[in-house]
Amino acid sequence: MARIAGVNIPTAKRVVIALTYIHGIGPKFAQEIMEKVGLSADRRVHQLTDAEVLAIRETIDRDYQVEGDLRRDTAMNIKRLMDLGCYRGLRHRRGLPVRGQRTHTNARTRKGPAKAIAGKKK
């Protein structure tokens, strides 16, 4: 099992698909990495030589921000917004949708489970 960017990628899958198991690499970046390294898209992970795995690993380390670094940057950007006190930061702080979605109905994913309200009795 190959280990790239701190993630064990599955050996039976095609390399393009296996690279998407790394946080920060989607199908587009995976294809781009394969082209930079010069590998066929049909290759499977277990068919790769150690040199090819090393080339993929070096390309990712050099050109892409993945896993912990990407998560840390995202968290720092959100924290910066909250410290500024801007509208987006306030929405993050209150746990509400940030990008203008309606909240009168829906937004349950962001707001959490519905709180019961005592209705009037008949």
UniProtKB/Swiss-Prot annotation:
Residues 99-122 are annotated as: Disordered. The keyword rRNA-binding applies. One of its GO terms (molecular function) is rRNA binding. One of its GO terms (biological process) is translation. Keywords: Ribonucleoprotein, Ribosomal protein, RNA-binding, rRNA-binding, tRNA-binding. The keyword Ribosomal protein applies. InterPro entries: Rbsml_uS13_C, Ribosomal_uS13, Ribosomal_uS13-like_H2TH, Ribosomal_uS13_bac-type, Ribosomal_uS13_CS. One of its GO terms (cellular component) is cytosol. Transmembrane segments: none annotated. Belongs to the universal ribosomal protein uS13 family. Located at the top of the head of the 30S subunit, it contacts several helices of the 16S rRNA. In the 70S ribosome it contacts the 23S rRNA (bridge B1a) and protein L5 of the 50S subunit (bridge B1b), connecting the 2 subunits; these bridges are implicated in subunit movement. Contacts the tRNAs in the A and P-sites. Part of the 30S ribosomal subunit. Forms a loose heterodimer with protein S19. Forms two bridges to the 50S subunit in the 70S ribosome. PANTHER family: 30S RIBOSOMAL PROTEIN S13/40S RIBOSOMAL PROTEIN S18, SMALL RIBOSOMAL SUBUNIT PROTEIN US13M. This is Small ribosomal subunit protein uS13. It comes from Allorhizobium ampelinum (strain ATCC BAA-846 / DSM 112012 / S4) (Agrobacterium vitis (strain S4)).
